[in-house]
Structures are given as C-alpha cells and as structure tokens.
Amino acid sequence: MSDNEKSTQTEEPNFRYNAALAQDIENKWQKIWDEQGTFWAANVNGDLKDGKGRNAEGRTAYFAMDMFPYPSGKGLHVGHPLGYLASDVVSRYHRMKGENVLHAMGYDAFGLPAEQYAVQTGQHPRVTTEANIANMSRQLHRMGLSFDNRRTFATIDPGYVRWTQWIFSRIYDSWYDEDATNPSGSKGSARPIAELVAKFESGEKAIPGHESDGKQWSDLTDAEQQDILNDFRLAYISKSPVNWCPGLGTVLANEEVTAEGKSERGNFPVFQRELRQWSMRITKYGHRLIADLDGINWPEKVKLMQRNWIGESHGASVHFTVATADGDKDMEIYTTRPDTLFGTTFAVVSPEHHLLENVPAEWPADVPEDWKGGYANPVEAVKAYRLAAEAKTAKDRVNEAGEKTGLFTGLYATNPITGAKLPLFTADYVLMDYGTGAIMAVPGGDQRDYDFAVKFGLPVIYTVTPLPDSGDDLANYEGKAPFVSHDGIVINSSVEATEAKGDALSLNGLRVDDAIAKVNAWLESAGVGKGTVSYRLRDWLFSRQRYWGEPFPIVYGEDGTPHLLPDSALPINLPDVPDYEPRTFDPMDAESNPEAPLSRNEDWVKVELDLGDGKKTYYRDTNTMPNWAGSCWYYMRYIDPTDTKHMVEKDEFDYWMGPNHNKYSGDEGGVDLYIGGVEHAVLHLLYSRFWHKVLFDLGYVDSAEPFHKLFNQGMIQAYAYTDDRGQYVPADEVVEGPADASGEPTFTWNGEHANREFGKMGKSLKNIVTPDYMYENYGADTFRLYEMSMGPLDESRPWNTRNVVGGMRFLQRLWRNVVDETTGQAHVTEDTPDEKTLKLLNNTIAEVTAEMEGMRPNTAIAKLIVLNNHLTGLKAVPRAAVEPLILMLAPIAPHICEEMWSKLGHAESLSAEPWPVADERYVGHDTVTAVVQIKGKVRAKLEVPVDIDPADLEKQALAAVADRLGGKEPRKVIVKAPKIVSIVPAE
C-alpha cells in the first residue's frame, strides 16, 4: 500500500491533507474562481472586464500563452501539460506583481489529425472534434489553470473561420512592392493589389509581356488581367511541382515532409508532381524574416533553425539562351559562384522544366549513344525520364550518394560570357521548386557536376586554384577530382571584347570574392544577369485536398477566372455532408491524382451569385486551407473573440501587443511569453511571422513580430516495458525487483521477466499516465508541484509516478504547519519571528523571486521546502513567516494555498495579493555558496544558509541537477554542509 493510500484511511484526522481532501479543496476553489471571474483579464474598452467589474485602470499588460492543442481523441497524458503549467505559474506570478494578465486557451481544431480521428471512429469530424474539445477542456480546468475562459474558442467556430478567410482575402488582394517603405522603415512592403493596378493603368509600371506591343491595361481582357495579377499576388494559384502523398490523398508543404522524403504524419512516401495549387509568396519576406529575428527574445537554436530553413544566399541570376525550333528561349539560373561561369561545360534542367516542351523531334548529329538513354528521339526520352523522376521522392532525387542519372535533351544553351555552346541535360537531382529549376554545371568546382561529367564524358575546366601559401596544388585534383573551395585564385577566366558579348572580361589572378563582384558588374552591364539574393525557402503550398479545413473565399467563373468573394459573404462554411473521407491511394502510386472531397458535393460547389455585374453561375474552390491557417493568427483573437467588427481592434492590440506596451516587449512588441515545443520552429512559427508581417505592412496591426519571447519546454519522457516477445505490457502492472549482478534493477510482469526502455509516453507503449489518475490519487496541486519540480523547464525529464508522493508529503507538512488536522482551524502564532527565521524567510523571498523571474520553478520549490522544514522545527509557526511562504507557493500549488489563506482569515482570493518583497535588512547575511559536484565536476552552485541542515542541502542539490541524473536515484550522495555536495550517479 502506498503512503498516499495509507493517508486516506478512515482513522486519519478529519482534516488530514490527502487525495480526498485535495479534491474537495480544488473543486471548491475552481468553482469560486469561475463564479468570481478571478482570472478575467481587463480590456481597455468594451465588455471584457475583470471579475470585479473593473477595466484595466492603467495596469501594465502582460500577455502569456501556450501553443494551443489539437483536440485529440486520446485526451491528455501527463506529458502534455508541462508547458501549460509553466505558463500558468508565470501568469499567476505576474498577477501577484500587480499586472493585468491575459492568459487564455483555444483549440486548433481543423486539419489532418482531427479528420483522421473522425475517419477512424466513423463519426463526422465536427462531432468528434467538439467532444474531444469538451474532454480536453475538462482536464485542463481540473488542473486549476488560470485561464480567462470568456476568451476560449476553436478554429472551427464560424466566427473564427470568418476572420481566417478575411485574412486570406487581404493576402490575396495584396502584392509585395520592393520599392515601398514598410512601417518599420525598411524597403519592401505588402500593398493593396489596387495600387499595382493603378501603376499598370498609369504606365508607371510596365505590363509584363506587353512591354513592346503598346497595349494598355484597359486593352486586356479580365482573364488576361487576372493572369498578370496572379503573378504578383501574395496568395496565388500556380501549376508547379508539389509534394504529392498518395497515402494521405493530399499535397503537402515542404515543411510537412521529413528529411527522409516521407509525410510527417503517417510516414508515407512523398512524390514530386506538377499540379495546380494555391501558394503564398512567403519568399518575398525571406530577408525580413531573417533580419527581424535579431530583435526578439527567442532561443538561439530556434533562430538558427529558421535562418537555415530560409537559407539566404548571395549570388547572381544569369540568363542563358537556348536555341529551339520555336526560336531562342531564355533559361535563367541562379548561382552563388558566378565567378565559375568560365568553367561551365554543360547545363542541367529539372525534368519538370518548361524548356523541355521545346525539345527537338530528332537527335542532333553526332550525339553519343549514352547521352540518349536508349531512346529513339528526345521527345520519348524526356517524357520517359520525367515519369521516372516523378516516381521518386525528393530525398531520393537529391541523394548525394545515389547514382547520378540524366540524359541529353537535344538542346544547347549558350554561355552568356564565353559564347560556348553547352549541351543541355535533364537530371532528377535538379528540383523545379529550388532555385529556377536549372543549373550551370561546373565540374571543375563541384563534386556532383564532376561525377556527372565523368559519367557522360563531358569536359572539365578548372577555374580556381589553391592559394599559393595553402600548401595545396591544383595538380592534386586535375583529372581526379574537383577543386571545391571558396577561397582561391581564379584562373582560365578571361574573354576578349566582342560586339555580341560586350566588354572584355578577365577574372584571372583575383581572389574568389573579388572575382564575384567583378563578374556581377559585367553581367549587369551586358544585360545578361545581375547580382541577387536567393532563398532556400520555397513559397508556402497552401491548399489541401481534405474536407476538414477552412474553405477558400474564392469562386471561379465559367472561364475559370478566380473571383474573391466580398467580406459580407464570410464565413464560407463547410457543407454538412456524409461523405467527407479523402480519397487515398496505394502509397507508392505516384501517378494517382488528388481528389478533393468537396468536389463531390455539386450542390455546394455550383452557386448563383451577383458579384456586381449581374447574377451568374460560379464554382467554389474545392480545396481547403491547411491546418496552419487557423494557428497563424489565433493569438490576436484572444484579445477579444467577441468582436464582430474587427479581426482585432487597434487600441486593444496596442495595449496587449503593441511596441513597448510594457518593459518586456521592446520596439517589436508581440506576445510577452509564448511557450511551446521546438518542433514548430519552421512550421507554425514561421508561418505566423509571415502572416503577421503582411498584416503589419497593411496597417492592421502595429507590432512587427507576433511573439516577443519564445520559450521551448522540454519533453516528459517515461519508461516502457516489454515482455520477452517484445510486446509492450502495461507499465503500471510492472513490479520492480532486486538489482542484478550489474546493479541494475530487475522487472517482472505477471511473474514473468520484463525489459525496461526509456523514451516517449504513448498509448501504444502502454505507459500513459493521465492527469485524471493524478487528480484522483494525489490531487491537482501535487501533480502541478511534481511537474514543476522535476527539473529545468527547458530540458526533458523522466516521469516516475513513485516520486510524486514526495510532493504530497511537502504539501502535507505545510498544511500541518498552518491547519490543525483535528479541528480544521488555523493554528499559527502572531508572535514576531526570531532573527534566524527572518533571515531565512527574506533570503528565500529574494531567491524565489529571482527563480520565478528566470522561469526556474524547480529550484524555487526546493528553496520553499527548506523554509517550510525550518518552520516545522519551530514550537509555533509565525503567521508573518508562513503567509509569505503560502504566497510564494501559490502560483505552483494554488488550491491548497487559497484554502490555507482563507483559513488564516483572509476574505479575498490570494491571486491578486502582492508578491512578497524581501526586507533588505535580512537579505544576504549568513549565506554561503554550496558547490554541487557529479563525478568530481561542478554542475551547480547554490546560495544557502551557513547553518543549513544537511538533509535540506541534499534536497536542494538533487533538485538543481535533476536533469543530469536522468530520473535515477544516485548511487551515493556525500554532503559536507554547507559548502559541498558530491554525487555519484547510478551507472
């Protein structure tokens, strides 16, 4: 029988703090908080006031939030709430600092996870999603999270969908003007598409494709105008290579495909297909998305991940001429090494490149047989090669170690500098959605180009030689390998002046960087290229062939021209249909085609509308938005989800998120604290920043960034157990036995040997512990206390239910210090604490305040335990000492603290009580720095009282290095109070 089970026996005093009493206390205070609106945040204007009927009254705003959850059918396990508890502790702390705290929770309810769960259960997604939300909301409420529940919403709510579609409409109706000044003062800004039309109408901007034919904007048909505008819109339709996943029956964004070329969800193969889809022109914001990272308080690892994903590089755009039967065609390439143009001996295009529509009907004379791939003519060869390429995943195509494949197209490109005639190949390692889908091949300076040249017998020209003092020599490479280096001396790179090519150019003798600058200037003067910036980032594929997502506010006329629906028509709701399952295919069927479930609902698709020129027949777009759409802007809707006139009202936005709205936010503004997993670094976080910047440019919001501070919580891990067959067995039924010869514990299940492994917590691993189990057996406060004490918030930590009882014992001891277990009344003394107590109390206040500011609740808890242990040793517990202790513990274990506060005679909730302030007369005296060593290496330092009890010092030391011990009990702990704790970890 566990200690906790013993504590619930009938012979216990009536007011012993145990699981049953904890539940009574927690239910009582949660009801009070709900009825009084204790955690209501006060808006500046309108009806959203705080629980006492006041408005903000000049209080400083503080906005703390979590990455909102998918409403999974499985509900929560104890690993999920770590971030929620952390943000709740921070929110409660800031309220006690006198700040007006906005802390709310919504639900990310559209998308693939919800749809797949509905398909599995045979119920409509709305039914399952709403049931899941209700269950998850119950679990979170029972945890005692201090949300303003008036601000709760789900992304599937029609009122929310309306504004998601409204934002899409603003993005669709915008273009990126490189010359405009954005609100931050730098160049480049989203502007209304009407301004672009005005530039075309006035002649200020040339009409693409009509620079020389004299046509005016008004001369073009509506369809022609829309085609041109589509090439500028920030949300646009294009036929381009996409990631097609037959196993899921939908296309995926690059960010949703793993490095192995599989779907992030389901792990299905992903193939490259050319399809007509919606995209968002996020690449226009590439530079700003990188540059503005410097102004926000994010973990460096996340900033680095975004910088690498965006992948800004400086190089040149170069135009080659390709001769075809239909005349000369332009082939644009992007290269980071324009200095190597003299070493280009062939060119390669993606199998999807538009130039391959112009291949000749016959092979040119004298083409080597191995260039033809065994095909009778270029048309057959290119078609077959393209089909083969589409059957490969993107990862397979760019695999450096894989066999280099390719074939000649029958076309030749002309080097714009040398005039050399270069054979044009197609190869699947060139991707259409990276760069321009065409590359100049320099086998003397690139390993992949070199391997390709060797395979097809193409010439190799070296244009860079090692530096004279490098100790290296080009002879070491010639005929053997490429010389790959950005630092060297340029050779074999000069051309005489000609009428066709322009001025003479010589790069010989220059260092590489100097050669790049010189050749870029020559390219621009010759009109065949220019220095430019490119990005690894691709435009965001924004449409999905799913049912459970936001419909696009777009309809098409009989001629296929898209039309944006007016705001008055929003929201466009999903039809309530019985057949919502996506059509999936054999995961390896690369030739399959997407089929949007909405296309099967003809009554919804075909509509009669009057869009200003009379009633006509239109057809709705049958794609839906990705699940990222709703999560791109949800943080703003917390400000006022009841507002039917604005996405967010400007005054309220500025109060909660505007630049310098408090001492934390800085010039960029944004949410003060955003807690969530690092796995969203290049998905949700990047997309949200993009949408926010568009809205910022257009004047709808006043902060340049959505989230000022980001904090990535760690992961709660757990042990799982298997039998000798390798099958997982219920972790809660496994019995730990004596250690074996190596000192490791043994385990049995139903009397049979069991094997232990460490990793994630999951239903399939049979090691889930639910919050409901914790509430029933320990209470929410003990659960909160345990999660916050397990180790640093930003590091992963192992769950061990056996260790939870330690937190319960601490709360029991504190309860006994305040409450008589027999009468249930407070029994503290009004006497002034002695000087030793005052010193420990005020040092604890100072130290715990610092820990709370630094989001280190684990070490704060350790210090509170030390203070409580001291109070336990006194003959009578002074009110003046225990009340500050209760206030400091309240953000972590709020229910029991509210109950003790009430029993001490306070009529109001302690949630708005001022945070304790240390009396400086007692701070800093009689303390010493204790060193915590593991295997002789210093791993932590603690400021502790000189007369600290060795047992208390041991507890603080173990808490400080809990993450380094991996959840295991140390083999030995040697305490030399007050200065040294030496730990020998378990092997």
UniProtKB/Swiss-Prot annotation:
Encoding gene (name): leuS
Organism the protein comes from: Bifidobacterium longum (strain DJO10A)
Matching InterPro entries: aa-tRNA-synth_I_CS (IPR001412), Leu-tRNA-ligase (IPR002302), Leu_tRNA-synth_edit (IPR025709), M/V/L/I-tRNA-synth_anticd-bd (IPR013155), Methionyl/Leucyl_tRNA_Synth (IPR015413), Rossmann-like_a/b/a_fold (IPR014729), tRNAsynth_Ia_anticodon-bd (IPR009080), Val/Leu/Ile-tRNA-synth_edit (IPR009008)
Similarity-based family: Belongs to the class-I aminoacyl-tRNA synthetase family.
Sequence positions that bind ATP: 763
The protein's enzyme class: ligase
Taxonomic classification: Bacteria, Bacillati, Actinomycetota, Actinomycetes, Bifidobacteriales
Keywords: Aminoacyl-tRNA synthetase, ATP-binding, Cytoplasm, Ligase, Nucleotide-binding, Protein biosynthesis
One GO CC term on file: cytosol
Protein name stated in the entry: Leucine--tRNA ligase
